Amino acid sequence: MDAFVYGTLRDPERARELLGHADFGPDALLRGLHRVDARYPTLAPGGKTQGRVLRLRDDDLEALDAYERVDRGLYVRVGVPGDQGALWTYVGDPTRLGAEVTWPGAGPFRRQVERYVDANDVRVES
C-alpha cells in the first residue's frame, strides 16, 4: 500500500533522504480531513488537504513509522480509501503537537481517527 503525504515528505529531497528514493504518484486530494499547522503538520476532521501519493517499497513503512514517531505516540498511521486503492497516511496527536483540534468520540487517539475515517466519506482522490 502507498502513502498519502501532505507535509515535509512531499519534497522529493526529503523523501529521498529518508527512504533512499522519491517515487511519487500523482498529486492527490484528501477529502474529509484538513491540514493543521502545529509543531508539525497534522490532519483534523472536515475539509480537504492537497498532497501527493508516495510509492512505497518493502521497508519504507518501518522508516516512515520511525520518522513520524509512531512508537512514541506522536503520530498514528491509518488506512484511508482512495480511487486507486487504499493508502496509508499519518495523523498527529493534537495534544502532543500543541494543535487546537478536537476529534469526535472517546478512547485512544488512533480509534478516534479510525472511527472518523470509517463513519465519514474520507478518501483520497488523484
Residue locations for each model-derived region?
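Glycine-aromatic micro-motifs
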Residues: 1-126
